[in-house]
Structures are given as C-alpha cells and as structure tokens.
Amino acid sequence: MSRVGRKPIVVPAGVTLTLNGTELTVKGPKGQLVRSFHEDIKINIAENEVIVERPSDNKLHRSLHGTTRALVSNMVTGVSEGFTRTLELVGVGYRAAKSGNGVTLSLGFSHPVEVTPEEGIEIDVPNQTTLVVKGINKERVGQIAAEIRSLRKPEPYKGKGIKYSNEVVRRKEGKKGK
C-alpha cells in the first residue's frame, strides 16, 4: 500500500470539494481548481477529510494511488493558502521592475526581457533583485518560475544569473594562472 496514498487529506474550513464522475472541483477562499483523475481511483469525500483508494495492487493502480493523493492535496492547499516561488537575480546590472501585469527583466542582453504571467498567476517584485511568483496551481507556479530561471541560469564561476531563493549554486574554480 502506498505510504503517501494511505494518508487522509485534511480539508480546512472554507474549502469545498465536489466530485462529478472523474472530475474533482476544489473551491476555496483563493479560487477554484478543476482536474480530471483516472476512473479506477476512488476519491471518497467525508466531512473534513478526503481518502484516496485504489481497486487492486497492480502496477498502474499502485502508481496512480500516491500521485492522485498528492495532486488532490496540492489542490486543497492551493485554494486555501496558495503557493509561492521566490527567485533572486544575482549579477551586476541584473534587475527586475514591475510593468503593468508582467515584469521587465534586465539580464545583460541588448534588450529588456518582458515576462507576462498567465491568468491566475501573479508576479511580485519586492525589490530590484527579487521576484515572487504566486498562484493557486502548484504546477503552473513552478513552471513559470522555471521559465523565468531559464532566461539566465546561474553560472558556476561567478554565480551570476537567476536562481531560486533556496538554491545553492555549485561554484567552480577558474583557470590557474602561471
């Protein structure tokens, strides 16, 4: 039995779950998320908890069990608390500025880079070298943060680039002189 899949999901106050066939709708104070799941996996909604069950121990059902439980848990957390990813810009002249709905990044290119988030995702700029990506969908928040990071990945010699706030950039020693 999946150790992740066995755990019940505690539903906080103010969050409602609706199961329509294989489609689960989660509504909360921050918004609403809808997702379809595999028809073999059963999602039981009780008063303040959700239990995910599988019909058999075959390989497909075992793999779907923990995955489904994690996805439902992320949906519940997203609509109640939301998710954030913090990025830091390291390097001389690397800065970010809020522009309308999106962000303008100066990353050492000959042109500024415009990043416009999709609906449901918000990018804050607390200071010139920090970006905070916020949203209710964990996958989309992580994906947009990864796309921003990929514009200028941290390099190993000086550490310049865009990195996650908790990321440790492995440093290399430069060439040896004579």
Curated annotation (Swiss-Prot):
Q: Which domain of life is it from?
A: Bacteria
This protein's record includes keyword rRNA-binding: yes
Gene Ontology cellular component? cytosolic large ribosomal subunit
Gene3D superfamilies noted in UniProt: Ribosomal protein L6, alpha-beta domain (3.90.930.12)
* Pfam families the UniProt entry points to: Ribosomal_L6
Among the GO molecular function terms of this UniProt record, one is:
rRNA binding
What keywords are assigned to this protein? Ribonucleoprotein, Ribosomal protein, RNA-binding, rRNA-binding
According to its UniProt entry, the protein's GO biological process terms are: cytoplasmic translation
How is this protein organized at the quaternary level?
Part of the 50S ribosomal subunit.
Could you tell me which PANTHER family the record lists for this protein? 60S/50S RIBOSOMAL PROTEIN L6/L9 (PTHR11655), LARGE RIBOSOMAL SUBUNIT PROTEIN UL6M (PTHR11655:SF14)
State the protein's purpose. This protein binds to the 23S rRNA, and is important in its secondary structure. It is located near the subunit interface in the base of the L7/L12 stalk, and near the tRNA binding site of the peptidyltransferase center.
Concerning its family, UniProt says: Belongs to the universal ribosomal protein uL6 family.
The name under which this protein is listed is Large ribosomal subunit protein uL6
